[in-house]
Amino acid sequence: MEIRIELLIHEDLQTFKKDIQEAFQKVFEDMYGPSEVIILPEADIDQSLNTKGAISYKATMNEIIVGGAIVVINRETQHNDLHFLYVKYGIQTKGIGKMIWDEIERLHPETLVWETTTPYFESRNIHFYVNKCKFHIVEYLREVNEAGFVGDGGEGMFRFQKVMKTD
């Protein structure tokens, strides 16, 4: 299986957004049942895409988008953030997410620390980040969320860090 990681281009943006929303929605609904609420609103994706230092990637296999990521690179501190990483719904658990992450690390060798978050209920993501990608859980975020946010199922989020190298 050959996965290519490329910069997301404008022509692929709607597919990227639709696929990431579906992936997040299905994971939430698998845990909590059907929801009328969109778990990952387009505005949240747009906010990440428009964050200073944001780089968005698509992962393709046979020229079909199978996943992607949005990272935010702080060129001064090299403490960088993984805002989103997804694998298209229906093809998870085949190693695609790990291939995406490995390529992101390769593309950003100057990174000192990576940081990301995932919902408390998402045990598959926790396993992925801790056991596959070698992140460490550094904080449990159980704060009151902004009005309308349900993406953590009301259970909070874990914050992860991965120290790549020391200053």
Name these PLM-found stretches.
Residues V87, T93-R106, N131:
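Conserved acetyl-CoA-binding loop-helix of GNAT-fold acetyltransferases
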